[in-house]
A protein has these predicted regions:
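N-terminal entrance/gating region of PLP-dependent enzymes' catalytic architecture
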Residues: 2-160, 170, 183-191, 220-223, ...
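PLP-dependent aspartate aminotransferase-fold enzymes
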Residues: 2-28, 103-115, 120, 124-319, ...
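Short Gly/Ser/Thr- and Asp/Glu-enriched loop/turn motifs at secondary-structure junctions
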Residues: 157-159, 260, 523-530, 609-611
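Short secondary-structure boundary/capping segments
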Residues: 178-182, 280-286, 335-340, 369-381, ...
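Intrinsically disordered, low-complexity acidic Ser/Thr-rich regulatory segments
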Residues: 223-264, 386-406, 594-611
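Conserved PLP phosphate-binding loop immediately N-terminal to the Schiff-base lysine helix
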Residues: 295-297, 321-333, 352-397
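Active-site C-terminal subdomain of aminotransferase-like
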Residues: 331, 380-527, 534-541
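Conserved PLP-binding catalytic core of the aspartate aminotransferase-like
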Residues: 517-596
Length: 654
């Protein structure tokens, strides 16, 4: 893709350029938003009128005065006014007073692009229904591939491929689908008896190839097939198809190949619940999801190595190892580099499997690590201007993304785009040949001769049968206005990381200020822009009492449609710390620092087997308002101190 003329290399994203990115906490950019939306809606009307202008208007000028027309307009206005009134009870994600879940204000380029595209109503299932936006979606996949370090040159055979999804859940499902198709395909080739290919010697070896080798075998098969006469080509394609897992189904496939077992998926205990849903949807079964313990908020790679060795010894196949780049609850990064290394060692011993990174939250943080030419910045280069970011483990995890097989990223999280916009990216697009579904009424026509032509029939390769082109336009335009490197989009994510460091420092000051009344700690060093805070009233030793105290604090920071929004000073969220996520040593350390007796972490299933903590997602770029000299982070801790004292006073009075 050519460099975006709107954002040249010598023009980094500055503070005042950030000011133009959003509608703003106070709606400061309302004139700009209104001007552009009206301009492009008018442009859409002109487009309609210029399509065969000789056709007479189907709606007469007199229709607007007819009683039925007026009655419909009146009813529509009434319902829209009621909708608008009801929406005033929505959570104010746009405000720097919101520090709750993974959502903030929307980037105006994406918002306007989505509004602009909606009246055209493109369906990105194919170029017949979306001749413009389907190309944009393919480009978005390449933009994201470049951001994570995958090959993004469509002229290369091993170029990456990505597409948008409704969210991270569907992207994770697509990752499972791709990994399973690739894992089982060499077995189908053996069963079909395809000649002239260097096939593995038995089903076990075929089912446990390294993904790179399985992809090369797929490419060899397609090359061999293309060289056959037309009739034989059709025969061999059908023969292999009838041996594939997708054709036979799980039961028949594993019955025919008795030495094989349904593969496991290895994931950290902090993995999103979508992995459980995905295994159920795919028919693998929830029991195949093996959740591994954490050590210091990161996947315990010793446990991973032990599990892989046990699987190899017991001849239990593994479908994939999952790393999380920015956990939903804590924002922490798993050691992607060490997980990839563990896979390489296992594959060398005959236990090949995929590595997938669930970077739904942390994916866009890679912009901070990328130069304009797509190369990786050193840790020292990235660290300039920060107090502690990035930890060596974080830089190593980002650097290793290029060595993984697939990645989930959510533009509707740290990409500041409307909900309903996730993304799946695979390292090598050739594997999508295993996903292709043919439907002549949608995908008929000549065979594709290039990367872009191939993926204009996007619906052949994705789970959805219909998908919004407006979402693709929103992401594409956003990435064009804010290229995915440290000078452009990375300046925005940098603001959030600086806010996280400021919050961490503020939490330490808060703890000193409240010493003797409440014990407060940041339980672990933040990896990203999500910071947790653990609290316990001084003198209390019971986990149940500490949990009840934090619940009462959070009650004042949660949305309540029965109350006016203005009664809320701040919005936050909460989560829990569990021994299986932290490890016993870390859990004991945290409980000890809070003055809690570990014996009261009873684990009887009534909620006191975990510690409830406050969770703060620091996405808003105006948490530190330089224009007005206001720190909403400082205001938050002032508010928190006041609420803590009120709750303690009420408890003492009782």
């Amino acid at each position: 893709m050519t460099r975006d003329a709107l954002m040249p290399a010598e023009s980094p994203l500055t503070r005042h350029r950030i000011d133009a990115c959003f509608l703003g906490p106070y709606g400061e950019n309302n004139n700009l938003l209104e001007k552009l939306v009206v301009e492009f809606l008018r442009d859409h009307v002109y487009w309609r009128r210029n399509f065969h202008p000789e056709d007479p208007p189907a709606i007469s000028t007199e229709a607007s005065r007819h009683p039925d027309y007026l009655a419909f307009e009146s009813r529509m206005r009434r319902e829209l006014h009621q909708l608008s009134a009801s929406l005033k009870k929505s959570v104010p994600f746009h405000s720097p007073r919101y520090m709750g879940h993974m959502v903030s204000d929307l980037l105006m380029p994406g918002l306007i692009a989505q509004i602009l595209t909606l009246p055209y109503n493109p369906n990105n299932v194919s170029e017949d229904s979306a001749p413009v936006t389907v190309d944009m979606e393919v480009q978005v996949g390449l933009q994201l591939a470049r951001m994570v370090g995958y090959v993004h040159d469509p002229l290369r055979a091993d170029c990456a491929f990505g597409h948008l999804t409704s969210g991270g859940t569907l992207a994770n499902y697509q990752a499972l689908r791709v990994a399973l198709a690739l894992k089982a395909f060499p077995v189908a080739l053996r069963s079909a008896g395809v000649p002239d290919l260097d096939l593995p010697e038995d089903d076990w070896s075929a089912f446990n190839l390294h993904p790179h080798k399985a992809t090369q075998l797929l490419d060899d098969w397609l090359t061999w097939l293309a060289a056959q006469p037309l009739r034989e080509r059709k025969t061999w394609r059908q023969r292999v198809q009838q041996e594939r897992l997708e054709y036979l189904g799980m039961l028949e496939f594993f019955t025919r190949h008795a030495q094989l077992r349904v593969p496991h998926v290895l994931a950290p205990v902090t993995a999103h619940y979508s992995w459980s849903k995905g295994l159920k949807l795919l028919g693998l079964g929830r029991s195949q999801l093996q959740l591994l313990p954490e050590q210091g908020m990161r996947l315990d790679t010793d446990a991973l190595e032990s599990t892989l060795e046990k699987c190899r010894r017991e001849r239990q196949p593994v479908l994939m190892s999952v790393a999380v780049l920015g956990t939903t609850e804590y924002g922490t990064f798993d050691p992607v580099d060490r997980i990839v290394a563990a896979r390489e060692r296992a594959a060398a011993l005959g236990l090949g499997h995929s590595v997938h990174v669930d970077a739904a939250w942390g994916g866009y943080l890679a912009t901070v690590f990328r130069n304009e030419d797509g190369s990786l910045r050193s840790r020292d280069e990235v660290a300039r201007g920060y107090h502690a970011f990035p930890a060596p483990e974080v830089h190593a995890a980002i650097a290793a993304l290029a060595d993984t097989d697939s990645i989930t990223i959510d533009p509707h999280k740290l990409g500041y785009l409307p909900f309903g916009t996730g993304a799946f990216i695979c390292r090598d697009h050739r594997v999508t040949a295993l996903l292709s579904e043919e439907a002549d009424y949608v995908f008929g026509g000549a065979s594709a001769t290039s990367y872009h032509e191939r993926y204009r029939g996007l619906g052949q390769f994705i789970p959805e049968g219909s998908k919004s082109g407006a979402n693709a336009a929103a992401v594409y335009v956003t990435h064009r206005v804010l290229p995915l490197d440290h000078l452009h989009f990375g300046r925005l994510t940098r603001q959030t990381l600086l806010a996280a460091e400021s919050f961490h420092a503020g939490a330490n000051r808060f703890a000193d200020k409240m010493h003797g009344r409440v014990n407060a700690i940041v339980p672990f060093q933040p990896d990203s822009n999500l910071v947790c805070l653990a609290l316990n009233p001084a003198g209390n030793t019971r986990v149940a009492n500490a949990n009840a105290f934090v619940h009462r604090l959070h009650d004042d920071m949660r949305a309540d449609p029965r109350q006016p929004l203005q009664l809320k000073q701040f919005f936050g969220s909460m989560t829990t710390l569990r021994p299986e996520a932290l490890g016993d040593t870390e859990m004991r350390r945290i409980l000890g620092q809070l003055g809690l007796d570990v014996a009261t972490l009873d684990g009887v299933g009534n909620g006191d087997d975990r510690l409830v903590i406050l969770r703060h997602t620091l996405m808003n770029p105006y948490l530190i308002d330089h224009e007005n000299g206001i720190s909403y982070i400082d205001l938050y801790f002032d508010y928190l101190a006041s609420r803590v004292q009120q709750l303690l006073a009420a408890h003492d009075a009782a």
